[in-house]
């Protein structure tokens, strides 16, 4: 088992070297249908492995709790770096400023997804266990494999209708003592609906499209326009399905714990 732990770390190191040598993964490298094919091939390969050779050392290692901890630890470390280092789509050492597009981050997530699938294939079915692990696998798959299919478009929204389906009806900004904007919000009419959007509080235009407020006309006291960015996420439903499954799994886990405690108290 320890040798395979070492192999996992060696492959991770190789992915880091690959990142340093080649740079970020091309934006469309994992785009549909390649991402869906990779996920399906991974699931099928693991299903065959655990049906035909479940006693192999690699198969036992991949489905073990020890391996889950190892992979979650490396993912947690990557997420800490992600939170501490400002992310920009620019060249940086080992991709530290654009982690989601690095070879080594994709390597970590693919291994973790494989581990979750392996655990599901080798454990006795329990609904709460299935919901938690399958939900996490779906959420990770949607976030990682679905990111190449994401697209965004920024545009200026004026008070007059320009044929985009969006017009600005009012704008409000708050300023700090040094004169810099501390927050702002725009009242927009989108597809016939009056909505208010703020920074980091997008409007869900469709199931797959979110409209973000990113900037505004700073050349005059009363802005003539604001700038919004529409982000299209085709895999958003997969991510939300995974999140909902994990929430249901957590509720069942809590309910099971309460039921178990009551049974113990009844025996005393």
Predicted stretch roles:
Residues 1-268:
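Solvent-exposed, non-transmembrane regions of integral membrane proteins
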């Amino acid at each position: 088992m320890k040798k395979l732990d070492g192999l996992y770390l060696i492959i991770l190191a190789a992915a880091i070297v690959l990142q340093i040598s080649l740079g970020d993964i091309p934006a469309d490298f994992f785009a549909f249908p390649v991402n869906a094919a990779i996920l399906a091939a991974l699931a099928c390969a693991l299903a065959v492995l655990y049906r035909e050779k479940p006693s192999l050392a690699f198969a036992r290692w991949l489905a073990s709790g020890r391996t889950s901890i190892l992979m979650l630890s490396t993912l947690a470390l990557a997420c800490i770096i992600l939170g501490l280092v400002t992310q920009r789509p620019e060249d940086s050492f080992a991709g530290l400023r654009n982690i989601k597009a690095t070879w080594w981050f994709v390597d970590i997530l693919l291994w973790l997804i494989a581990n979750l699938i392996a655990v599901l294939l080798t454990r006795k079915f329990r609904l709460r266990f299935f919901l938690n692990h399958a939900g996490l696998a779906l959420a990770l798959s949607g976030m990682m494999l679905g990111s190449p299919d994401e697209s965004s478009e920024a545009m200026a929204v004026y008070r007059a209708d320009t044929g985009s389906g969006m017009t600005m009806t009012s704008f409000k900004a708050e300023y700090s003592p040094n004169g810099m904007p501390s927050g702002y919000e725009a009242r927009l009419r989108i597809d016939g609906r009056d909505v208010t959007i703020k920074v980091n509080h997008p409007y869900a235009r469709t199931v797959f499209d979110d409209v973000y407020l990113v900037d505004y006309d700073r050349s005059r006291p009363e802005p003539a326009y604001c700038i919004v960015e529409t982000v299209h996420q085709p895999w958003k439903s997969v991510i939300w399905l995974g999140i909902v499954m994990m929430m249901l799994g957590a509720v069942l886990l809590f309910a099971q714990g309460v039921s178990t405690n009551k049974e113990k108290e009844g025996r005393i």
